[in-house]
Swiss-Prot record:
Cellular localization per UniProt: Cytoplasm
UniProt name for this protein: Holliday junction branch migration complex subunit RuvB
Binding-site list for ATP: 24-25, 66, 69-71, 132-134, 175, 185, 222
Gene Ontology MF term list: ATP binding; ATP hydrolysis activity; four-way junction DNA binding; four-way junction helicase activity
Subunit structure: Homohexamer. Forms an RuvA(8)-RuvB(12)-Holliday junction (HJ) complex. HJ DNA is sandwiched between 2 RuvA tetramers; dsDNA enters through RuvA and exits via RuvB. An RuvB hexamer assembles on each DNA strand where it exits the tetramer. Each RuvB hexamer is contacted by two RuvA subunits (via domain III) on 2 adjacent RuvB subunits; this complex drives branch migration. In the full resolvosome a probable DNA-RuvA(4)-RuvB(12)-RuvC(2) complex forms which resolves the HJ.
Region of interest (Small ATPAse domain (RuvB-S)), ranges: 186-256
Gene: ruvB
Species of the source: Bacillus cereus (strain ZK / E33L)
Intrachain S-S bonds: none
GO CC terms: cytoplasm; Holliday junction resolvase complex
C-alpha cells in the first residue's frame, strides 16, 4: 500500500470521504466558499449561456486535488438546470466506452470527466468531433469493408478536471472554451468551511479551534473537513463534545500534524534531503528511493504544498531545501 493511501493530509479523495463530501457539497455558486475569481467568471458565462438559450462552453478545471473541482462541476449543472453524468479518465478504457456515455446524454447535459489527463490518445480523438461539432464518428466493420458512420449528438457541456493540466494534449486543451485554475484557499475561507461543516455535523466548535484546523489544512477544504472529523472524535471521547482550542491542539499533535500542516511524510522528505544530501540539490529519483515513494506521487502530491510555503525549490540541478525549512526544524543550514 502506498503511504499516500493512509495519509490524513492527502488532498486526494479517499473512500471514506465520498459520502461526507456529497452531504457537505454546496449546490449553488452563492453557497460555494472561495475560488472567487473562478466563481465570478463562471457566474457570467453561465448567465450569458442561459440568456442565449445555449449550452455552456466546455470547461476545464485544473489545480491541486481537494480544492472543489467535482463540486464545481455539479454546481455548473445545477445552475444550468440540467443533469450531470460523471465518469473519469481511467474508467474510459475503449472508444466504445466513451461512445456509450456520449449517446446517453440528453440535450444540455453536463458530462464531467475527472482525471481527464488520463484519457488514452485514441479516446481523445473520438472526443474531438464530439466537443467541436456534437457528432460521433464510429467505424462499422473491419478491414477493407469497414466504413465510418457519423452520429449526431445532443448539445452538451464537457467539464474536465485535472491535477495535471500540462499532461493534456494541446488539441484537447484547445477545445475548452473556459479554463479555470483553482487556487489554494486562505485560512479565513477554510475556517468558514470548517464552521459550516461543524453545523452539518451538529457539533459545537470554537472560532479559534476552527482557525487552528484551517491553519493546518494546507489550503485544502477536503483536508480541513477530514481534520475536523478526527478532532471531533477526540472532542467526544476526551472532552464534552465541543471542539475547543485545547482539544484541537491536543488532537492535531497526536495526529502528527504540525502548526504549518506538515505531517510525518513531509518531515521524512525534507529531513531526508537535509540529513543525507546536505539540503540538496538532489534528483527526484534519488528522493523517491530515499522515502520509498513513486516519483510522480512526490511531484504531484507531496511537493506542491512544500513549494507553496517556500520550504522546497525545484531547480535544474534538483530539489533544494530552503532556509525556511531549516528554521522550521530548528536546524542550521550547512555552510558552503
Amino acid at each position: 500500500m502506498s503511504i499516500m493511501d493512509e495519509r490524513l493530509l492527502s488532498g486526494e479523495s479517499a473512500y471514506e470521504d465520498a459520502d461526507l463530501e456529497y452531504s457537505l457539497r454546496p449546490q449553488t455558486l452563492r453557497q460555494y466558499i472561495g475560488q472567487d475569481k473562478a466563481k465570478h467568471n463562471l457566474e457570467v458565462f453561465i448567465e450569458a449561456a442561459k440568456m442565449r438559450e445555449e449550452t455552456l462552453d466546455h470547461v476545464l478545471l485544473y489545480g491541486p486535488p481537494g480544492l472543489g473541482k467535482t463540486t464545481l462541476a455539479n454546481i455548473i449543472a445545477n445552475e444550468m438546470g440540467v443533469n450531470v453524468r460523471t465518469t473519469s479518465g481511467p474508467a474510459i478504457e475503449r472508444p466504445g466506452d466513451l461512445a456509450a456515455v456520449l449517446t446517453s446524454l440528453q440535450p444540455g447535459d453536463v458530462l464531467f470527466i475527472d482525471e481527464i489527463h488520463r484519457l488514452h490518445r485514441s479516446i481523445e480523438e473520438v472526443l474531438y468531433p464530439a466537443m467541436e461539432d456534437f457528432c460521433l464518428d464510429i467505424v462499422i466493420g473491419k478491414g477493407p469493408s469497414a466504413r465510418s458512420v457519423r452520429l449526431d449528438l445532443p448539445p452538451f457541456t464537457l467539464v474536465g478536471a485535472t491535477t495535471r493540466a500540462g499532461a493534456l494534449s494541446a488539441p484537447l486543451r484547445d477545445r475548452f472554451g473556459v479554463l479555470s485554475r483553482l487556487e489554494y484557499y486562505t485560512v479565513d475561507q477554510l475556517s468558514a468551511i470548517v464552521e459550516r461543516t461543524a453545523e452539518v455535523f451538529e457539533v459545537e466548535i470554537d472560532s479559534l479551534a476552527a482557525l487552528e484546523i484551517a491553519r493546518r489544512a494546507r489550503g485544502t477544504p477536503r483536508i480541513a473537513n477530514r481534520l475536523l472529523r478526527r478532532v471531533r472524535d477526540f472532542a467526544q471521547v476526551r472532552g464534552n463534545g465541543t471542539v475547543t482550542m485545547e482539544i484541537t491542539q491536543m488532537a492535531l499533535e497526536l495526529l502528527q500534524v504540525d502548526k504549518l500542516g506538515l505531517d510525518h511524510i513531509d518531515h521524512k522528505l525534507l529531513l531526508g534531503i537535509i540529513e543525507k544530501f546536505r539540503g540538496g540539490p538532489v534528483g527526484l529519483e534519488t528522493v523517491s528511493a530515499t522515502i520509498g515513494e513513486e516519483s510522480h506521487t512526490i511531484e504531484d502530491v507531496y511537493e506542491p504544498y512544500l513549494l507553496q510555503i517556500g520550504f522546497l525549490q525545484r531547480t535544474p540541478r534538483g530539489r533544494i531545501v530552503t532556509p525556511l525549512a531549516y528554521e522550521h526544524f530548528g536546524m542550521e543550514m550547512p555552510k558552503v
